[in-house]
Amino acid sequence: MSQMGLKAAAPRLQRIVSNVEVERKFNPGPKFASLFLSDGQAKLQAQPHEFYGNKDSSSFTVIRQPGKLIRDTYYDTHDSNLCKLGLWVRQRYVHVLPSNPLRFERRQDDKAVVERVLPLPTDESRANEQWNAKLRLGGNFSNTQFVEFDGKKKVSDEVLRITKTKTRLEDLRVVSDLLTRRLSWKVTRLANGSAPSAKMTIVLDEVTEAEAINDGSDKSGFIHTIGEVELFEELVTEDKDNEGHEAHRKEVATRRMDELKEFMLVNAGLFTTTPKPIGKLSAYDTWSNSRS
């Protein structure tokens, strides 16, 4: 084979950048609420604070992040084909809130819930919405590995790729419109004194149906509170083709999931997983189907 033929047969190497996210869900119980949602903690922002997760005094340090109001409009085909393929497509609007705008109360069942004291984003603000998609690499609905796509073109390309060009972004329909009030804490130091291997965030979400809030009513009755611990990493390769990058991405996602699992097991009293945590989309689908 000629030298030119060898060059033509060689795989094309390039700089490839992608995002990897792994997450594990938990039920925010009374211990979580007492440590993270007390009046004193609610006033702390951009200040490191050490938490002790268990009786052996295993500790980690967090910094509370600004609260957010998030509107997610999810899209799929009429037969939910994208969901079946492990792809979730949405338009997301994020509004960063001023210090301590969210107040929490505790219900009789000891679940922490956010008081609904914030307005829904207006139609004028929807121009700031961004297209986003999450493709599941592995795991299940409680413990999941994702790769993310940001921007309309990347999302559109992924929809075409995963459906083998059978479905365009314009062919999708709205399947849910949800409003999330979010509190989050960035983990800066683990029990061994080291920093997490990637950006680690503890998240508490209260989710409602956006349309019901927009109508000024509570007619939907849908409300769901769920916690997550997430690891997010930007992955860059310089010496791999697309196939090699994809394989490396899956390896990294698996390692990060193992790290997340260990962190939550060490602090099992804070991040309870019994009964099995239910994600917001699963909870919404169950609620919606019960009303059909």
Q: Model-found features: residue ranges?
A:
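Phosphate-end processing signature that detects enzymes handling 5′-triphosphorylated RNA
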Residues: 2-292
